[in-house]
Amino acid sequence: MKNTTLCYLEKDGALLMLHRVKKQNDVNAGKWVGVGGHFEEGESPYDCAVREIFEETGLVPAALSYRGVVTFVSDEWETEQMHLFTSDDFLGDDRFPRYTGGEEKETDCIEGNLAWVEKSLVPTLPLWEGDKIFLSLLAENEPFFSLKLVYTGDALVSAIKNGLPL
């Protein structure tokens, strides 16, 4: 099982989102996601989140909230356990453009284009169905949760939160 982190940075009613449009053979191609990535040897979830945020954005979180663990099971890729964080307290140049729909601006992230997206606009973006579930839980300030998302191909076939089907 692979371990990853994902973090949603928040500022002025918007989330920093990454539109995955630059990498070849990307399972997330065309989707909007938070920032994060794979663990390196010896990293804790917190260490990984801080490193990935800095590598992808140049920002350094001053504080992170550990919000949940999401387990992805699929018939097409390795099972993944994703550690989910949020932060509204970070240091650095948060110069990324605001995305309001339509054409987006190119940014220097090698994985895609970064943009601040109004929270109300996020559900209208191309997202994984499971991401819509945990983004909703984050928006509702759900206490720490365990979420299991099962996919057949690109289709979400099962979602279980804290042991109970959704």
Identify the function of each model-found stretch:
Residues 26-30, 78:
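A conserved beta-turn-beta hairpin within the catalytic core of GNAT-like acetyltransferases
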Residues 23-27, 41:
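N-terminal first-folded block
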Residues 39-62, 72-138, 159-166:
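Unchanged
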Residues 1-17, 35-40:
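Conserved N-terminal beta-strand and adjoining loop/helix that marks the start
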Residues 144-166:
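Acidic/histidine-enriched, glycine/proline-rich intrinsically disordered or flexible terminal extensions
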Residues 16, 24-25, 73, 91:
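Flexible, glycine-rich phosphate/dinucleotide-binding loops
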